[in-house]
């Protein structure tokens, strides 16, 4: 088409802006909205927030522009060397005569790049605590089950069939896209929508389900917005994405993970027949226990009746004994009173004159007083004698009295007592104490003596 255009316009003259606009028109009209896969290189993010980079493959390069609003929607960091798939429109930039791809959507393409993004996102969300929430228990018999999945395909049919087969209950389906650019947002909005329903319409449990697929097919279930919605849900969530070997980030934020959508239905409701059998078994156990309890209490009543009859008989006997004792007391009381009166009369005859007793006690007190006075005088005289004897002995032992008899006390210069020739041999100055005073003596010579 470009060749035909040039041939038809061979003789026409264009200005630079005219030919640039024509080229831009041809590019945009002939290519429109396209997808291109390649490797990012030369990434630059301007202060305006726009990103500029090249998409390369071997030696071919395609310039790309990602405007700030689009860049803000990309949920992972861009790096040189990252393999991506870009959706957008081709256009030309008249400023330097080049064509470029204006980015509308950008997704990781290579498995390695996707796993790197997934691991970085997982580590960041785990650090925030989004995978460590307190799990909400799945109710035993939910009255309503919310299912978030695609309305077409085998998944929704399997879930409905399995629930109806096990324990029929009301199912509320919230249809969403389970693959594609905006499916993560749709699923997150569905979770929030179920949580915002009135209590009467709100399901007891939510199943988020999708069939198996590649990591690219399941990528929406790694969306950060979806993970946060699952974390914030007040309704317990069962995640059933892919097969048993498939793990997505919603599995870590959900309250329970099911290996398959069918297993999620089994987690949501019990088997009705098994439940009925269990209830019947419990009913039999309850009836048997009730029957045994009734028999036990009947036997207790019989035993209590026997005890009551025995106690009645016992009380009657005791009452009879009490009555007989009362009668005997009434019969014996006159005799007892008469006996006591006789004793009182006898005591009256034998009682002693108080004046005689007083005279006797006065005389006895006089004798005791005289005896105590004499004993005290003797004891005092004995103490005085012993005191005088001890005083004489003490005076004889007083060294001052000894000094008066012509003896003296000899001390060294330091005041130490000298009691022998040996202790005085090394002393030059002596202090000699007599009975009437003390003198100091200085030794000049030593005269030998025995």
UniProtKB/Swiss-Prot annotation:
<dbReference type="GO" id="GO:0008855">
    <property type="term" value="F:exodeoxyribonuclease VII activity"/>
</dbReference>
<dbReference type="Pfam" id="PF13742">
    <property type="entry name" value="tRNA_anti_2"/>
</dbReference>
<dbReference type="InterPro" id="IPR025824">
    <property type="entry name" value="OB-fold_nuc-bd_dom"/>
</dbReference>
<dbReference type="GO" id="GO:0006308">
    <property type="term" value="P:DNA catabolic process"/>
</dbReference>
<comment type="function">
    <text>Bidirectionally degrades single-stranded DNA into large acid-insoluble oligonucleotides, which are then degraded further into small acid-soluble oligonucleotides.</text>
</comment>
<comment type="similarity">
    <text>Belongs to the XseA family.</text>
</comment>
<dbReference type="GO" id="GO:0009318">
    <property type="term" value="C:exodeoxyribonuclease VII complex"/>
</dbReference>
<keyword id="KW-0963">Cytoplasm</keyword>
<dbReference type="InterPro" id="IPR020579">
    <property type="entry name" value="Exonuc_VII_lsu_C"/>
</dbReference>
<keyword id="KW-0269">Exonuclease</keyword>
<dbReference type="GO" id="GO:0005737">
    <property type="term" value="C:cytoplasm"/>
</dbReference>
<comment type="subunit">
    <text>Heterooligomer composed of large and small subunits.</text>
</comment>
<dbReference type="Pfam" id="PF02601">
    <property type="entry name" value="Exonuc_VII_L"/>
</dbReference>
<keyword id="KW-0378">Hydrolase</keyword>
<dbReference type="InterPro" id="IPR003753">
    <property type="entry name" value="Exonuc_VII_L"/>
</dbReference>
<dbReference type="GO" id="GO:0003676">
    <property type="term" value="F:nucleic acid binding"/>
</dbReference>
<keyword id="KW-0540">Nuclease</keyword>
<protein>
    <recommendedName>
        <fullName>Exodeoxyribonuclease 7 large subunit</fullName>
        <ecNumber>3.1.11.6</ecNumber>
    </recommendedName>
</protein>
């Amino acid at each position: 088409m470009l060749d035909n255009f040039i041939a038809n316009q061979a003789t026409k003259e264009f200005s630079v802006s005219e030919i640039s606009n024509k080229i831009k028109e041809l590019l945009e009209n002939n290519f429109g909205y396209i997808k291109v896969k390649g490797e990012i290189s030369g990434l630059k993010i301007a202060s305006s927030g726009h990103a500029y980079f090249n998409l390369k493959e071997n030696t071919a390069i395609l310039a790309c522009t990602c405007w700030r609003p689009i860049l803000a929607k990309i949920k992972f960091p861009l790096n040189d060397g990252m393999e991506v798939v870009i959706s957008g429109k081709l256009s030309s930039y008249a400023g330097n005569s080049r064509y470029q791809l204006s980015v509308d959507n950008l997704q990781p393409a290579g498995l390695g790049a996707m796993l790197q993004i997934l691991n970085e996102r997982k580590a960041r969300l785990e650090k925030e605590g989004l995978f460590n929430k307190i799990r909400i228990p799945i109710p035993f018999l939910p009255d309503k089950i919310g299912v978030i999945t695609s309305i077409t395909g085998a998944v929704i049919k399997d879930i409905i069939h399995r629930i109806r087969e096990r324990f029929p209950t009301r199912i509320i389906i919230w249809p969403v896209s389970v693959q594609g650019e905006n499916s993560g947002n749709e699923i997150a909005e569905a979770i929030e929508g179920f949580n915002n329903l009135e209590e009467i319409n709100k399901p007891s449990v939510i199943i988020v389900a999708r069939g198996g697929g590649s990591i690219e097919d399941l990528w929406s279930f790694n969306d950060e917005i979806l993970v946060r919605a699952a974390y914030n849900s007040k309704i317990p969530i069962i995640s059933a994405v892919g097969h048993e070997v498939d793990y997505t980030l919603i599995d870590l934020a959900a309250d329970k993970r099911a290996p398959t959508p069918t297993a999620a239905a089994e987690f949501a409701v019990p088997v009705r027949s098994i439940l009925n059998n269990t209830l019947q078994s419990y009913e039999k156990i309850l009836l048997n226990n009730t029957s045994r309890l009734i028999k036990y209490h009947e036997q207790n009543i019989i035993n209590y009746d026997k005890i009551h009859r025995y106690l009645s008989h016992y009380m009657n006997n005791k009452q009879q004994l009490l009555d007989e004792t009362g009668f005997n007391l009434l019969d014996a009381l006159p005799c007892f009173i008469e006996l006591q009166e006789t004793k009182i009369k006898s005591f009256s005859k034998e009682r002693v004159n108080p004046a005689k007793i007083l005279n006797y006690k006065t005389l006895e007190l006089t004798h005791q007083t005289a005896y105590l006075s004499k004993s005290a005088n003797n004891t005092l005289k004995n103490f005085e004698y012993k005191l005088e004897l001890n005083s004489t002995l003490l005076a004889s032992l007083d060294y001052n009295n000894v000094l008066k008899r012509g003896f003296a006390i000899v001390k060294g210069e330091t005041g130490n007592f000298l009691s022998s020739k040996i202790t005085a041999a090394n002393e030059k100055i002596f202090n000699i104490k007599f009975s009437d005073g003390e003198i100091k003596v200085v030794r000049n010579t030593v005269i030998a003596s025995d």
